[in-house]
């Protein structure tokens, strides 16, 4: 699910950069590897990431309130396929429900809420691009996502870390959240 809040040409950031520009939320360190189906690391894979802020809004929904490109960034995997960045633990939020979508949800007796998640578009030269999310598994809406985007393979372990040494290593406040998520890219056919 791409969703309506993706922005083309987001800021290209170095690994380890902090995407949170409004200072709200619980610190989160996100890391993982990008590999081929054979398990080889993919250097230079492009990871376009975005999420809502701690109030449940994307920057494009709050122009003039949130900084532009808040909680957005484009990262490139390192030689070992690794990537990492700093953000905030995602929150659930309601999708806009003041139009036809809202009427449909009401008729179906469904709520408009999405469980907490991070968005990714991941691709590399010679590989198929994937558009996906990773979800917080214990979110209240995990079993009733308004857009039916949750799959078991997209549930990630968001772990609360209380370790001043690790917090200093990642340049985040202690305690903080940490999530590791790895991607496997298939080669382009033809």
Regions found by a protein language model. Name each.
Residues 1-190:
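Beta-strand-dominated extracellular/periplasmic modules and repeats
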């Amino acid at each position: 699910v791409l969703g309506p809040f993706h922005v083309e040409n987001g800021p290209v950031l170095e690994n380890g950069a902090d995407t949170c520009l409004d200072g709200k939320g619980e610190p989160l360190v996100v890391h993982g590897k990008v590999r081929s189906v054979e398990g080889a690391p993919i250097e230079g894979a492009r990871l376009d990431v975005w999420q809502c802020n701690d109030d449940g809004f994307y920057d494009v929904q709050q122009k003039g309130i949130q900084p532009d490109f808040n909680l957005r960034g484009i990262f490139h995997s390192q030689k070992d396929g690794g990537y990492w960045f700093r953000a905030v633990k995602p929150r659930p939020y309601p999708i806009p429900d003041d139009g036809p979508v809202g009427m449909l949800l009401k008729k179906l007796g469904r709520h408009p809420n999405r469980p907490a998640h991070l968005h990714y578009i991941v691709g590399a030269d010679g590989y198929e691009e994937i558009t996906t999310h990773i979800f917080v598994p214990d979110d209240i809406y995990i079993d009733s996502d308004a857009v039916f985007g949750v799959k078991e393979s997209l549930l990630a372990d968001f772990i609360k870390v209380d370790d001043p040494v690790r917090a200093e290593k990642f340049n985040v406040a202690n305690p903080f959240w940490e999530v590791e998520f790895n991607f496997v890219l298939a080669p382009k056919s033809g």
